[in-house]
Each structure stands twice: as C-alpha cells, then as structure tokens.
C-alpha cells in the first residue's frame, strides 16, 4: 500500500505501507501526485483526463489557488496544463444544479455576524446540502471583516457544522472544542442535539476561542 497525503501523520496512521509520501506544506495530495509523475519524467505519460482530474483536485483544495498555494503548486498546475489539462473542462466539473445554487444562496442570506464570524444555518434538508453548505461557508469569507464562517445544517437527524477561515481564526480549535477537527482553515463537527442547541454551543465555542486568542 502507498500513502500520499498532505495531512500530518496521525498516531493511528495507515499501516503497513511500502511507501509513505507525506508533506503537510503541500497544497493537496494531487499536487504531490503530480510532483511524483513529473519526477519520473517522460516515461510517466498521463492521459488528458488524468491531468484534468489532478488539476481539479488542486483547485478544489486551494480554493482556486488562494489557500496554501506555493510556487510548487503553480509548477504542478503548469505541468498538468502541458499534459493537456483544459481549465474550462475542469471548471465544468464543479458546476452545480440549480437546486444546489438556490440552497447555497438561501444559506448565505441566513447569515449573521457574530464576533467577526459569519454564521449561517438551515433546518431544511436536501440531497446536496453538504455541497451547498461547504460552498456557502467559502463564499461567506468574502464579507468584509469576517475572519471565519460557520454553516450549520442537518443530515439524517445529526447536526453538522462546516467551518472555514483565511487563517486569522483557527477553525480547527473551534471545531475541536465541539468534538470535531480539521485544519487551520477548514474544519467540521457533528452534534447530536437540536438546531437551537447547536447554535448556542457554537456561539459558546466562538466566545471561548476569542477569549483565549487575542483579536487583531
């Protein structure tokens, strides 16, 4: 088994492996895979579809080359472009249904500001709620003065919270206080409680975070 990942090694990581390529400073696993392909030279030709899939992964994890984007990220993208990756085709991979677009807009409209955080929620549920919530959380970061965004929604009787930031607020810490986890800029948790209780617990977690971390 081969493990290629841009996350830090976990205590209970995947074992045994014949090779582990872990680089937390990389933007994405797709960047690492691309680097390996490039390393092996001309003998490692890839199809256009494979190149587009790898470029899509890089664009997804970096939010279109905004988050965790380094020189090596652009070098990987340039290599994939040389291999025939079509950026228009990649863009189409992220197209939403009209229902998802409407739900994302509804979530954004429900948002309010709380201590430099944008918080949105919905009690409605539909098949692509996770996609809509994730995209809404990303877009809420575009509001002036917002350091983090949180979107609360329900699936199968469980309350979910998707959290995002640009780095000024460590949403991993906020979500860990609610039993979840993730990264500095992307995290999540699940709660077995009502929507109102989840909103209160999130507010308390935000309060606790800012009490322990001075606001700049």
Residue ranges with predicted function:
Residues 6-76:
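Short alpha-helices
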């Amino acid at each position: 088994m081969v493990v290629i990942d841009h996350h830090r090694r976990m205590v209970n990581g995947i074992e045994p492996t014949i090779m582990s390529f872990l680089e937390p400073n990389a933007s994405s696993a797709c960047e690492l895979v691309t680097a390996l392909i490039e390393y092996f030279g001309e003998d490692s030709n890839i199809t256009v579809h494979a190149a587009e899939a790898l470029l899509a992964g890089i664009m997804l994890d970096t939010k279109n080359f905004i988050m965790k984007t380094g020189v090596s990220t652009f070098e990987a993208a340039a290599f994939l472009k040389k291999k025939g990756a079509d950026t228009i085709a990649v863009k189409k991979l992220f197209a939403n249904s009209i229902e998802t677009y409407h739900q994302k807009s509804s979530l954004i409209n429900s948002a309010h500001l709380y201590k430099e955080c944008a918080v949105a929620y919905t009690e409605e549920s539909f098949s692509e709620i996770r996609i809509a919530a994730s995209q809404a959380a990303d877009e809420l970061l575009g509001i002036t003065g917002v350091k983090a965004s949180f979107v609360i929604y329900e699936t199968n009787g469980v309350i979910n919270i998707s959290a995002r930031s640009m780095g000024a607020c460590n949403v991993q810490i906020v979500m860990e206080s609610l039993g979840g986890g993730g990264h500095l800029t992307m995290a999540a948790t699940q709660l077995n409680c009502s929507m109102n209780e989840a909103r209160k617990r999130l507010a308390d977690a935000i309060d606790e975070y800012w009490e322990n971390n001075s606001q700049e």
